[in-house]
Amino acid sequence: MLAGRGARAGGGLPRGWTALCLLSLLPFGFTNTETVITPTTVPTSTEIMSAVSENTSKREAITLTPSGTTTLYSVSQDSSGTTATISETTVHVTSTSEITLTPGTMNSSVQSQTSLAITVSFTPTNFSTSSVTLEPSLLPGNGSDPPYNSTSLVTSPTEYYTSLSPTPSRNDTPSTIKGEIKCSGVKEVKLNQGICLELNETSSCEDFKKDNEEKLTQVLCEKEPAEAGAGVCSLLLAQSEVRPHCLLLVLANKTELFSKLQLLRKHQSDLKKLGIRDFTEQDVGSHQSYSRKTLIALVTSGILLAVLGTTGYFLMNRRSWSPTGERLGEDPYYTENGGGQGYSSGPGVSPEAQGKASVNRGPQENGTGQATSRNGHSARQHMVADTEL
């Protein structure tokens, strides 16, 4: 019998321990909190509702409008459903980037259930954003007291940085000047104003343009800020035919010449880098050379003109000539006798001979160059006969 009782006592012991363990596992206060989150997407509005549904006397609903205004409605009602107080609180926010719901615990035998409905619509914006945190907490209380549910709205601003590149003003906009160099022959240039650019070594206009066009236009096309603007700056260069080291910068007038000289003096260091050692104001016509054929033709023409002029001068200083090569108007008799000085009234001459000489002198002085004839004979023959006599 004792053995049978001991066997029964041994069989019932595990049941007692099991019951004792079950009793020890039961807590004095039972709390069960269940959170249900139901996401719903509506493209036109944003709503956040939080409600505590079982054995609670206070429920809150939070609504976020898309325009950036958050409205909190606090509704207090008793267990029978009668509304006691309605209060409204408005908080302005720009947008919602984060929503956190943190339920707390309460040492009570009342079981509460919280449901949250979230409606989110995405709208791109370039403004500053803020982070909104909703923290509903259940404070501990007695089992007989209604549970107190509080929701705190915490807004933490988030800085939004936007890097904007500065927009340049109209005055700060750099001027765009396109420069170009044109090469021409010095004989084809019709202008007279020019500046001779002395190069360190002999170079043609095309070679100089190929190597230094951009840099030279930057120096000579510089303008004041008030005159700056989009345009084209054209420079005309001509190769000198007299001086191989000289490139002529041809200019239109004195005003442009004075302006370019100032720029060249201002940028002398830059000119040396371009191979220009010096610059002087010179006339374009002085750098034109004539060809050898042209020079020969000019010299020949000058010599012929000189010969013709000399010949004409000597001809103008002499009278007309006779066929025998003697000057007309002079009698050979006068030439032989000293121009008519041989007639004298010497003591050995008879008066008849003097009369004949005076008679013969008249025809010789008549200006015809020949004496009058008598009986078909010239006066010269009679004079010879008289002289012989």
UniProtKB/Swiss-Prot annotation:
The chain crosses the membrane at residues 295-315. The keyword Membrane applies. Residues 34-294 are extracellular. Residues 361-378 have a biased composition (Polar residues). The modification Phosphotyrosine is found at residues 333, 343. Residues 1-33 form the signal peptide. Keywords: Cell adhesion, Glycoprotein, Membrane, Phosphoprotein, Signal, Transmembrane, Transmembrane helix. InterPro entries: CD34 (IPR008083), CD34/Podocalyxin (IPR013836). GO terms for cellular component: apical plasma membrane; basal plasma membrane; cytoplasm; external side of plasma membrane; glomerular endothelium fenestra; intercellular bridge; lysosome; perinuclear region of cytoplasm. Residues 325-389 are annotated as: Disordered. It is a single-pass type I membrane protein. One of its GO terms (biological process) is glomerular filtration. Selectively expressed on hematopoietic progenitor cells and vascular endothelium. Residues 316-389 are cytoplasmic. The modification Phosphoserine is found at residue 350. Possible adhesion molecule with a role in early hematopoiesis by mediating the attachment of stem cells to the bone marrow extracellular matrix or directly to stromal cells. Could act as a scaffold for the attachment of lineage specific glycans, allowing stem cells to bind to lectins expressed by stromal cells or other marrow components. Presents carbohydrate ligands to selectins. This is Hematopoietic progenitor cell antigen CD34. It comes from Canis lupus familiaris (Dog). The gene is CD34.
